[in-house]
Amino acid sequence: DYLTTHIWPLNWGWVDSADLAGTWAGGEAKVRDYMARHQAIAGRLGKPLVFEEFGFPRDAGLYDPGSPTSFKDRYYRLIYGAVLDSAAKGGPLMGSNFWAWGGEGRAAHPDHRFAPGDRLYVGDPMHEPQGWYSVFDVDESTKAVIKAHSAELARMS
């Protein structure tokens, strides 16, 4: 028995994909507060907590594989830092699951939208642009952030 939460700064209006540089600080503060409040709830309930679904857009609101992910990488490091900090202190936050692995998948259409009959899937649901939150096989910096976090967790166990 454990608790889960989602964290979606863009969907919740905490950042603006057209101005990530200008809205990052405010969004980061809201994410930090949200994480702290949910860790406190988990602590009071005596339950482990997993940030089981979190994602962040690519820079400049782009969706294409290989487009810049500098703010996504910062966001992942923010989430992963909270997980590592909790693990080091014996806190309730036990893990996280990013949304979503797109791998070698690619959007079928230039507008990144699903069309009737489409079967290609890159992690983002069909009502969202494909590539919005996906981590693709060519996203080297994001993969490096994920790999470093995994290695740090392994060292702690």
Could you tell me what each predicted segment is?
Residues D1-L62, G81-L84:
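Glycoside hydrolase catalytic-domain groove-lining segments
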Residues G61-L78, A82-S157:
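Aromatic-rich peripheral "rim/lid" segments of glycoside hydrolase catalytic domains that contact
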